[in-house]
Amino acid sequence: MKLGIVGLPNVGKSTLFNALTSTQNAQAANYPFCTIEPNSGIVPVPDARLDKLAEIWQTDKKTPAIVEFFDIAGLVKGASQGAGLGNKFLGHIRECDAIVHVVRCFDDDNIIHVVEDVNKPESVDPIRDIDAIDLELILADLEVVSNRLGRQQKAAKTGNKAAAAEAGWLAELASWLEGGKPARSFDFDEGDDAQKAVRKELGLLSAKPVIYACNVGEDDLLGGLDENPYFPLVAARAKEENAQAIPICAKTEEDIAGSTQEEKIAFLQEMGIESTGLDKLIKASYELLGLISFLTDGKKECRAWTIKRGTKAPQAAGKIHSDFERGFIRAQVIAYKDLEDADFNYAAVKSKGLQRTEGKEYVVNDGDVIEFLFNV
C-alpha cells in the first residue's frame, strides 16, 4: 500500500514524513521545492494485538503490517500545466493508492506561505489551501477525461454502442470536474465492470481517497483544539467528502519519533492523550483503503498480514505463500477477542469450541488468528 504525502510548500510535509519514518531523510526547509524527488519510507501499522501475541509466545520474530509513505514535492498554482515541479508532482501522486494531504492549521509569522490571498497577505486559510491542490488535480483529470471523451464520441458516431455508453458517463464526469469538484465525490456506477476498467486506465488523481492531516501547533495539543480556528473547518470539509481529518503536530511528532517506547508513553500521559497523532494517521491510512489484518502466531514468528476487507480464506492463505492457496484444505480460526477473553489460554479456547474450522467460502475478519492447512 502506497500513500503520498502532499500539500503546499512549507506546510510540514517533510517534517511529518521524518516523524513517520523516524529518520531525517526528508530535507525540511523553509523554502519551496526543498523536496524534489519523493522520499519513501516503510512504516509499521501499530497493532496492540500483534504486540500481545508476541509477548505471550515470547516469539523470535514479530512482523507488523506495513504502509509505504512517499514525501512528494510541494505544489504550486499551475502544476497541471507543468508549473513548478507540477509534472513530476502529478506523476508521483498517480503512483500512490491514496493521499495524505497535509494542511497548515497553525499560525507562525516565520513560516513562508506560498499561496497568498490579496485581501489577507500571508494568511492561514486551510480551505483555500485544500482547494488549491484539489484544483490542480481536477484540471489534470479534466484533460485526461476530455481526451478520452473526444475519442469515444467519435467512435460512437460509427455506431459503437459501448463507446456511446462510455461517452455518456464521461461527459457527466467532465461536467462534474469543470464545476471544480473532485472525482472522488462523483457518483460512479460501482456495478459497472466496464466503467471500473476505464477508471483504472484513466488513473484519476482527484478520485484517490484522502486523509487530511491537520498540522496544528503544540499549544493545541496541550490545550485541546477548542481554541484552534482552523481544524473545525477542515473537519467539516472532510465530513462532506466522507474523508477523515486528523489533528497532528508534525514538529512535536518528529521530536519524539526517536524516543523509546517508555518515553513515548510518558509523553502521552503528560499530554493527556491515548495515542500519538502518527499512530492515528497510520491506522486511518490503513483503513482508508479497506484493509484489515489477520494474524499468525507461534514461537518462531508472530505476524500481521494485510488483506482487503472481504477476502476469503484461500486468498488470505495465498498472502503467506501461493502453495497455501493452491492446496488450501481448511483454516483453523480463533477470533482475537475470544483469545483475549480467555486470558490467552489456548487450551481453554479450544475446549469451549471457540477455535473454528472454516472452509473455502469463509470471509476472514480483522484480527482473526489463523492456522492454515494445505496440501500440494
Across the structure, where does each feature detected by a protein language model lie?
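Conserved G1/Walker A P-loop phosphate-binding module
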Residues: 1-121, 127, 134, 151-152
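C-terminal-of-GTPase-core extension/linker across diverse P-loop GTPases
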Residues: 2-6, 11, 17, 151-365, ...
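Flexible beta-alpha connector loops of hexameric P-loop NTPases
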Residues: 75-81, 121-124, 131-137, 156-162, ...
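Alpha-helix boundary/capping and short turn/kink residues
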Residues: 105, 139-142
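Non-catalytic accessory segments flanking P-loop/AAA+ NTPase cores
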Residues: 121, 138-140, 178-182
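Conserved phosphoryl-transfer catalytic core
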Residues: 142-149
